[in-house]
Regions:
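N-terminal secretory signal peptides that target proteins for export/translocation
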Residues: 1-9
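Bacterial N-terminal signal peptides
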Residues: 12-22
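Sec/Tat signal peptide C-region and signal peptidase I cleavage site
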Residues: 24-29
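C-terminal, well-structured catalytic/ligand-binding subdomain of enzymes
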Residues: 33-81, 85-87, 92-125, 148, ...
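Secretory/export targeting leaders with adjacent low-complexity proregions
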Residues: 132-152
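Selective detector of the "anchor" transmembrane alpha-helix that sits immediately C-terminal
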Residues: 292-323, 384
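Alpha-helical transmembrane segments forming the membrane-embedded cores
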Residues: 298, 319-434
Length: 434
């Protein structure tokens, strides 16, 4: 009885571990800038994401003070889409960017943020200057956003940088931001990000507030990866003094659509799919049709199920190897299947948890985890093993020296290997020379 209970607890622990990895969302790169000349302030935003549902929507003030426009692509259930950038009627704009900050002690005696989407919308609905935003945010434990940095800009040109534990107001005529917390990031480290470095260099050559200039600046900071052409999903230029926004779709800066905030708010609350505003974009279609465990339930279930299968069968074959003392044909394969199974179990977890693996060039290199980087060579291991394993599988089918269960599990393992090799080829994991 105790053995059964321990087994159930062990399986539950495995499932919990896998599910934890599956629900982790990868960081999303973004960049932005603000430019102020005289009484004109422009705010530019690049939203780099693998989502395929970019939207712009307009919300009137209701019981709050100011109507606002927002852009975003991540659906947040009953809250609608989570805002990534936006601007209100008073010329206050913002952008949210993913950034690392080491955890510290949370703020005491402050309000908790229980609904981040509503919280971010309420700031634009309630504030008209960055000073008011700072006062508003100081009421909350904004360390809730431990993986984010925000920039707020008002039409005077002042800006507020919101980090998990720091609020900083500035008033320089230009400012460029990307995926880092400025208070803890030396300039030489920030310059390692191409989009930030390119933006700073562009501004050093001179600034103005024409739409052509602001578009060119966004263009030089956009991302487009070679593998499938993914990168910047939505770009926006917010004119904080005139209350307009120019949208650009999927790093194509030749076509833009402009909205006037006050005119749109007169139409009532409404939401528009950004894709419908622009001509057909083949690169975006490529992104939409590219399947991974993150956007395909079938592939996701297969990867998670394979992880469980590899872990359990690796243990099974190890026990089988030591349990049967008589000399069996190819018994060394059973011993070999243990490290192979553990290795593949780990790789399935990597594939379940990191979307970057599928979009960055092969072999994928993780700057923070050497084991994930090494795991990128596992597809080649399967290529080397599949033919000899298939031959041994065929011979074992003739004499069945492993027993029906052992032979069945080995055969099923080989079938999974073949499917995985096909998926690895589809994801271009073998294209290491491109």
């Amino acid at each position: 009885m105790m053995t059964r209970i321990k087994t159930v607890q062990f399986v539950r622990l495995i499932l919990l571990t896998i599910i934890t990895f599956v629900v982790i969302q990868d960081s999303i790169a973004c960049s932005g800038y603000k430019i102020t000349i005289g009484n004109r302030t422009f705010f530019g935003s690049n939203h780099d994401a693998w989502f395929t549902t970019p939207h712009i929507w307009f919300e009137n003030a209701a019981n709050s003070k100011y109507g606002a426009a927002f852009t975003g692509s991540r659906f947040d259930g009953e809250n609608g889409y989570a805002p990534q950038s936006g601007m209100n009627e008073m010329g206050l704009a913002f952008e949210r960017l993913v950034a690392y900050h080491p955890a510290q002690e949370n703020f005491k005696n402050r309000k908790t943020i229980s609904n981040p989407t509503k919280y971010l919308k309420d700031i634009l609905h309630s504030c008209k200057t960055v000073d008011e935003v700072k006062e508003y945010i100081n009421k909350y434990d904004h360390s809730y956003f431990i993986e984010d940095v925000f920039i707020y800009v008002d039409k005077s040109g002042k800006y507020l940088i919101v980090e998990p534990y720091t609020l900083t107001i500035g008033n320089e005529p230009t400012y460029v931001i990307a995926n880092f917390c400025p208070s803890i990031t030396p300039e030489q480290n920030a310059n390692k990000l191409d989009r930030y470095r390119n933006g700073v260099a562009f501004i050093k050559n001179g600034i103005d507030t024409t739409l052509n200039y602001c578009t060119a600046l966004l263009d030089t900071m956009h991302v487009c990866r070679k593998k499938i052409g993914d990168g910047t999903l939505i770009s926006s230029i917010w004119d904080l003094n005139n209350g307009t926004v120019n949208l650009y779709f999927y790093h194509d800066f030749k076509t833009t659509v402009q909205f006037n905030l006050r005119e749109e708010l007169k139409k009532g609350d409404h939401i528009i799919a950004v894709e419908t505003l622009f001509p057909h974009n083949p690169e975006f279609e490529k992104l939409r049709n590219f399947k991974t465990p993150k956007n395909s339930n079938l592939i996701g279930v297969f990867i998670v199920t394979s992880a469980i299968f590899f872990l359990l069968t690796s243990i099974f074959f190890l026990i089988q190897y030591f349990r049967r003392k008589e000399n069996k044909k190819y018994s060394y394969i059973q011993l070999l299947l243990f490290p192979i199974g553990i290795t593949l179990f780990y790789y399935m977890i990597v594939l379940s948890g990191s979307v970057k693996v599928f979009y960055f060039p092969a072999p994928y290199k993780d700057p923070t985890n050497v084991f994930i980087s090494l795991a990128s060579y596992i597809p080649f291991l399967l290529l080397l093993l599949i033919f000899p394993f298939a031959v041994i599988n065929y011979k074992l089918l003739k004499n069945n020296s492993w027993g029906y269960l052992g032979l069945g599990l080995f055969t099923f393992s080989n079938l999974i290997y073949i499917i995985l090799i096909g998926l690895f080829a589809y994801w271009k994991f073998y294209d290491i020379f491109n």
